[in-house]
C-alpha cells in the first residue's frame, strides 16, 4: 500500500469514528427512552440479564437476558433478528414472545432507532452469563403457538407515521409515547385477551387509565396537569402538589429523568393534546368519621399536615391530589397498606412512605382513606373494606 493510499485510508477511518460513536451514544439514549433496564434487570449487579417476574392470569413470565452473552443473551442475534423480535415479537429461535414484552409499541419505532439500540446492546453492554428463567405457566397453557393467533387479532407491526397536520414537537411526542416509551402498556385499559384496547391517540381509550399489579396507572389524557407540572413530574417525580410512588417511580428513576428537555416537552405536548371528557362528581361521596380523624392526626398529620397541604416539593399534598381522588382507589390503598418510595433523581433522593398494613384492619383503613377523600375540599367516592382486602 502506498503512503498516499494509507493516508487516505487513515483519514476515512478517522472521519468514520465519530459517526459510529454518535450512533452508540444515541443507542444508549434509546435504551433509556425504552427503560430497558427496569424490566430486564432483576439483580443490579447483572444489568440486562433478565429474571424480572411479570404476573399474568395463567402464571408468571420472566424477562430475558438481553446482554450480548452468546449462550444466554442475544449475542448471536443479527440486526435482522433483533428487529424481528422488537417489531414482530418473534425470537431468533423462532418462538413467539409473550406480549409482556411490549413489541406492540416497539413496532412503531424507526429502523434507524432500532439499529442504534442494537449497536448499543452489542457493543457497549457487558455480557452476562446468566441463564434465562423458564415461565411458571403450566402445559398446555405454556404452548406458544396461540400467541401467533393473538398477534393476528391484536398486533399492528406498522411503523409510526407522522401527522402532517401537527407540529414537529407533537409528532416527536407521539412517536416517543406510542413507541419506545410504551406508555400505553400501563396506562391503557386491556380487553379480555389482555390486549391493549388502543395503541394510539385516535382511540379515546388510549392512555385512559388501567389497573396493573395492584396499582392504578391513571388517565393521563388532556390537561389535568400544566405543561410545567407534568414535565417536573417526569423529570423529578415531584411537583408542588404531588409525588410519584409505585412502578412509575421506577420509570422516573431509571428512565424519564434522563430524557432530553425537548423530548420531555414533546411528550407532554402530545399527551395534553389528547381529548378527554370532564370528570363528573361521584354519585356517592366518601364520609369522614371521628375515629378516622383521630387516626389521621396520629399517623398522617405530622407529614401531610392537618390541612392536607403537605410540604412543598417534599411531602405531597393530599388536598386535590389526583391519586387521592382517582375513581379507582387501588394505588391509594396500596400506598397506605404497603408504603412506597419516591423516585431517586439528580434533584432529589427518594424517601419512603411507611406501610400501615400492620396497624389498620380493612375497615379502619377504608375509614381513614374515606376521611382523606372527604376532607379539605376533596370529593372522592367511598373506599370499601373490600377494596382494602383485595390489596392485602
Feature map (PLM): residue ranges:
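Hydrophobic alpha-helix feature that most strongly marks membrane-spanning transmembrane helices
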Residues: 272, 276, 301, 305-308, ...
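C-type cytochrome heme c attachment motif
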Residues: 32-41, 64, 81-87, 99, ...
Amino acid at each position: 500500500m502506498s503512503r498516499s493510499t494509507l493516508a487516505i485510508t487513515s483519514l476515512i477511518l478517522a472521519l468514520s469514528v465519530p459517526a459510529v460513536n454518535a450512533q452508540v451514544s444515541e443507542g444508549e439514549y434509546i435504551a433509556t427512552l425504552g427503560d430497558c433496564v427496569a424490566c430486564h434487570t432483576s439483580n443490579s449487579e447483572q444489568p440486562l440479564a433478565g429474571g424480572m417476574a411479570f404476573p399474568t392470569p395463567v402464571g408468571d413470565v420472566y424477562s430475558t437476558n438481553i446482554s450480548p452473552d452468546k449462550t444466554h443473551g442475544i449475542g448471536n442475534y443479527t440486526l435482522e433478528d433483533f428487529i424481528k423480535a422488537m417489531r414482530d415479537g418473534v425470537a431468533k429461535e423462532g418462538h413467539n414472545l409473550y406480549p409482556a414484552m411490549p413489541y406492540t409499541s416497539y413496532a412503531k419505532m424507526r429502523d434507524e432507532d432500532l439499529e442504534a439500540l442494537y449497536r448499543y446492546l452489542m457493543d457497549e453492554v457487558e455480557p452476562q452469563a446468566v441463564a434465562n428463567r423458564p415461565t411458571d405457566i403450566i402445559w398446555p397453557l405454556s404452548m406458544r403457538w396461540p400467541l401467533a393467533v393473538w398477534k393476528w387479532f391484536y398486533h399492528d407491526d406498522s411503523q409510526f407515521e407522522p401527522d402532517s397536520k401537527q407540529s414537529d414537537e407533537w409528532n416527536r411526542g407521539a412517536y416517543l409515547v406510542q413507541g419506545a416509551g410504551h406508555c400505553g402498556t400501563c396506562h391503557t385499559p386491556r380487553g379480555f385477551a389482555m390486549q391493549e384496547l388502543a395503541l394510539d391517540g385516535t382511540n379515546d381509550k388510549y392512555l385512559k387509565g388501567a389497573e396493573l399489579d395492584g396499582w392504578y396507572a391513571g388517565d393521563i389524557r388532556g390537561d389535568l396537569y400544566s405543561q410545567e407540572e407534568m414535565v417536573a413530574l417526569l423529570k423529578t417525580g415531584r411537583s408542588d402538589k404531588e409525588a410519584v410512588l409505585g412502578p412509575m417511580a421506577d420509570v422516573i428513576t431509571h428512565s424519564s429523568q434522563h430524557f432530553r428537555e425537548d423530548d420531555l416537552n414533546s411528550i407532554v405536548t402530545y399527551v395534553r393534546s389528547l381529548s378527554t371528557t370532564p370528570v363528573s362528581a361521584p354519585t356517592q361521596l366518601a364520609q369522614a368519621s371521628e375515629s378516622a380523624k383521630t387516626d389521621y392526626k396520629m399517623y398522617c398529620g405530622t407529614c401531610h399536615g392537618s390541612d392536607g397541604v403537605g410540604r412543598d416539593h417534599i411531602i405531597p399534598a393530599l388536598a386535590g391530589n389526583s391519586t387521592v381522588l382517582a375513581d379507582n382507589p387501588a394505588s391509594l390503598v396500596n400506598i397506605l397498606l404497603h408504603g412506597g418510595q419516591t423516585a431517586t433523581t439528580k434533584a432529589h433522593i427518594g424517601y419512603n412512605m411507611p406501610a400501615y398494613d400492620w396497624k389498620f384492619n380493612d375497615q379502619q383503613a377504608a375509614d381513614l382513606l374515606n376521611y382523606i377523600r372527604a376532607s379539605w375540599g376533596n370529593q372522592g367516592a367511598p373506599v370499601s373494606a373490600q377494596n382494602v382486602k383485595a390489596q392485602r
